[in-house]
Amino acid sequence: MSIKLINIGFGNIISANRLVAIVSPESAPIKRIIQEAKNRGMLIDATYGRRTRAVIITDSDHIILSAVQPETVANRLNSNKEILEDTLEEDEEEEEE
């Protein structure tokens, strides 16, 4: 199993294997989820002070805020041209040798 990483903006990278959902932060239920995660200490703000455009929910119940559009994150997830994935696979092959 190869590890696939996704760039969520400003040099921040997350594991695609842990991703559950990518949603827009506009709705009231998502705003509540963000606030609850903040209160529990499970919120990761990767916006660098910019406007939150995507909320990423992980299987570990962490909530990650990103300044990148949800569509962009999804496209990066579906892309077969991920440089990071290729790099990790090459590293794994070198370790096996």
From Swiss-Prot:
Q: Where would one find coiled-coil regions in this protein? A: none
- What InterPro entries does its record include? RemA-like
Q: Which PANTHER family match?
A: REGULATORY PROTEIN SSL2874-RELATED, REGULATORY PROTEIN TM_1690-RELATED
The family assignment reads: Belongs to the RemA family.
Which NCBIfam families does the entry link to?
A: MtxBflmRegRemA, PRK04323.1
Q: What is this protein called?
A: Putative regulatory protein Teth39_1325
Could you tell me which species this protein originates from? Thermoanaerobacter pseudethanolicus (strain ATCC 33223 / 39E)
